[in-house]
Amino acid sequence: MSSSTSTIVAIASAAGTGGVGIVRLSGPQSRQIAVQLGVARLQPRHAHYARFRDAQGAVIDDGIALWFNAPHSFTGEDVVELQGHGSPVLLRQLVARCIELGARQARAGEFSERAFLNGKLDLAQAEAIADVIAAGDLRAARAARRALDGVFSRRVDAVAHTLTRLRIHVEAAIDFADEPLDTLGGNQVRDGLTQARTLLAQLLRDAERGRTLRDGLHAVLIGPPNAGKSSLLNALAGSERAIVTDVAGTTRDTLHEAIQLDGFELTLVDTAGLRDGGDAIEREGMRRARAELERADLALVVLDARDPQAARAAIGDAIDAVPRQLWIHNKCDLLSDAAPLDVNAIAVSAVTGQGLEQLHIRLRELALGDGVEGVDGEFSARTRHVEALRRAERHVDAADLELGFEQLELAAEELRLAHEALGEITGKISADDLLGKIFSSFCIGK
């Protein structure tokens, strides 16, 4: 049966035992199944006490039944929620009875998928449901809540609306090719392109911040041996996670440690020191360090403050591929008062704690930009959103270039591709396989 004609059922409450458990039904048979379970009367948006019974009339459980009639429900279909005791055994028995009465087990994310397909929320909002549930702290939860409320989607739609107006002018210029572009609203096209680029740049910046709030930041500690990378990881983590000795090359493998820092998760990766030579085990450690850099959002380049230039030479070009870098001069407590400090680096001492507060501030700035906790526009975002915005930005830039050469057909195509990239975010333009991947990552009852 298709999703539009079948009735689905699943446990909607959290896994495990609890005070209350919820079984959710959605589809045309929801109300009928509830009646057959033993709910004598159902009024929309009213709570009704009932005993839920099996095929022989024995009581499975007792609790509350609520009916949300279409289209005034989460999915846009008839929805019934059966609230009973939070026993996994009883909840599974209740689901099995619903299936006997004509429902089928819901797929992962199918309730949210139906809400999307029925126009109750767009794709970015549907994804935000999972982000609200998975939020690791209050700031991430608030950002996810704003995305669910449509803050992100409305900004995407604003850019899309600007592109629509642009496309109208460019398509008109193509239809009237004998007329100069300026007589067909050339200034409006140029102004519109400027506005679109500005809106996209701002939205991309905020989406990258939202992705950091959702996914955290992957930061790799890199540098020569005995620069104090492991000591710095321990200082940032607030515990002795890495082995620290005075022997160069102590760290041979990678060590991952996740910490909470000002509203986002920072995953620190301690790595083997980079240098020429070393035994086979140390060389393997250095290979793994370089591999970690390829996946890094941020490189924390740790150098010995007493001789940073020599330490910098040992690293070579290993960090060139990492877009964001923070240079740290460790062991600053061992410097004489007259020793000069690099103004582009942060001086710290993992032993005394000197400079760690400044390091925290700089890490936050690199992760979240100049965003302030609690600003109205902060929202959660995902990697696919950021990638789609980057594609849209590239296509708008290309359209601007083509218009400069008066290549109107090519400019129109670039604007169409930019529009399409934005549509992928909200689901206005999405391939079926993309939708399947997104909703299959949800909980069964969501």
Curated annotation (Swiss-Prot):
GO biological process: tRNA methylation; tRNA wobble uridine modification
CDD domains: trmE, TrmE_N
Positions contributing to GTP binding: 226-231, 245-251, 270-273
GO molecular function: GTP binding; GTPase activity; metal ion binding
Disulphide bond pairs: none
Location of the TrmE-type G domain: 216-368
InterPro entries: G_TrmE, GTP-bd, GTP-bd_TrmE_N, GTPase_MnmE, MnmE_dom2, MnmE_helical, P-loop_NTPase, Small_GTP-bd
Pfam families xref list: MMR_HSR1 (PF01926), MnmE_helical (PF12631), TrmE_N (PF10396)
Principal EC category: hydrolase
Protein family: Belongs to the TRAFAC class TrmE-Era-EngA-EngB-Septin-like GTPase superfamily. TrmE GTPase family.
Name of this protein: tRNA modification GTPase MnmE
